[in-house]
Amino acid sequence: MKEQKWIHEGLITESLTNGMFWVRLDNKDLIIGYVSGNIRHSFIRILPGDKVKIEVSRYNSTRGRIIYRLRNKYYKD
């Protein structure tokens, strides 16, 4: 059986190396997020200030996988 995961929305606060970011969740928690394979494969650029959906494991709530970048009115895509 697959493990259950929580999905949160958050704001990218700082970019780290190798596709990792500090993400401030809507409940004010600060966690490390890494880019999922589909986002990496599609060359979707994630910058500080972007709103994202992040998938967090129930067992380790300090890290999460960024699964979606929410639309921003300033982007042209």
Curated annotation (Swiss-Prot):
Query: What do we know about how this protein assembles, alone or with others?
Result: Component of the 30S ribosomal translation pre-initiation complex which assembles on the 30S ribosome in the order IF-2 and IF-3, IF-1 and N-formylmethionyl-tRNA(fMet); mRNA recruitment can occur at any time during PIC assembly.
Record keyword Protein biosynthesis present: yes
Q: Which InterPro entries match?
A: NA-bd_OB-fold, RNA-binding_domain_S1_IF1, TIF_IF1
Give one GO term, molecular function aspect: translation initiation factor activity
Originating organism: Epifagus virginiana
Q: Identify its protein family.
A: Belongs to the IF-1 family.
Q: Name one GO cellular component term.
A: cytosol
Q: Does the keyword RNA-binding apply?
A: yes
One Pfam family name from the record? Answer: eIF-1a
Q: Where the protein is mainly located, per its record?
A: plastid
Q: What protein am I looking at?
A: Translation initiation factor IF-1, plastid
Q: What does this protein do?
A: One of the essential components for the initiation of protein synthesis. Stabilizes the binding of IF-2 and IF-3 on the 30S subunit to which N-formylmethionyl-tRNA(fMet) subsequently binds. Helps modulate mRNA selection, yielding the 30S pre-initiation complex (PIC). Upon addition of the 50S ribosomal subunit IF-1, IF-2 and IF-3 are released leaving the mature 70S translation initiation complex.
Provide this UniProt record's keywords sorted from A to Z: Initiation factor, Plastid, Protein biosynthesis, RNA-binding, rRNA-binding
| Superkingdom as given in the UniProt entry | Eukaryota
S1-like domain location is 1-71
Entry-linked PANTHER family: TRANSLATION INITIATION FACTOR IF-1, CHLOROPLASTIC (PTHR33370:SF1)
